[in-house]
């Protein structure tokens, strides 16, 4: 009980980050708007989640609704760009974000699509303190925006059921990432509003590996995600210098 109380009292929320994304909430579902990079990135991460989750739980990735028996958490869900496809694949979705505006936008859009997603304006530590548990946790492009990344990672990991999976996507704290993700994407190409990212809050691969182990999980896989300007598409790669995804699991009992 004391551990849950500590989690409830702690906050992963960075007010500046919440204000920044709340101001853009209405644009989540505009593929040509401020979240265009996420719309472009989405097919790659969706395919990765579908394939790895199906393989891990012995499911048929080609099935229409392969995730029907799984409970998912999309933490830092934003406007629901990941939550909606997962719901269509049958997952019982709990989608959380600390921005009330994001949750309102996501809820309205899901209702328009006829999707039953449990959207909540809350935090990882509050969900953990309430004793929530999940088979799969999607921790995508959020850890670099929280106040205490390693505490946030532990809170998320504490909600993972035995044998469960957590997907983590973030940016590496390298000079290359600063050049591509901040100077290039925000200042030169204008793909993202200036100030979207703070390079000092990026997570190195070594920090991620240590954080996953400290949270009681095992790292199954780590892969880079690279952008090809000639095709205007993202794909998995060996290059983890800028964008990368980590796949972690909790041991089965």
Swiss-Prot record:
One Pfam family of this chain: Methyltransf_11
Pathway: Cofactor biosynthesis; ubiquinone biosynthesis
Top-level taxon: Bacteria
Assigned EC number: 2.1.1.222, 2.1.1.64
Catalytic activity line of the entry: a 3-demethylubiquinol + S-adenosyl-L-methionine = a ubiquinol + S-adenosyl-L-homocysteine + H(+); a 3-(all-trans-polyprenyl)benzene-1,2-diol + S-adenosyl-L-methionine = a 2-methoxy-6-(all-trans-polyprenyl)phenol + S-adenosyl-L-homocysteine + H(+)
NCBIfam families hit by this protein: UbiG
PANTHER family the UniProt entry points to: METHYLTRANSFERASE (PTHR43464), UBIQUINONE BIOSYNTHESIS O-METHYLTRANSFERASE, MITOCHONDRIAL (PTHR43464:SF19)
Protein name: Ubiquinone biosynthesis O-methyltransferase
Species per Swiss-Prot/TrEMBL record: Parvibaculum lavamentivorans (strain DS-1 / DSM 13023 / NCIMB 13966)
Phylogenetic classification of the source organism: Bacteria, Pseudomonadati, Pseudomonadota, Alphaproteobacteria, Hyphomicrobiales
Gene that encodes the chain: ubiG
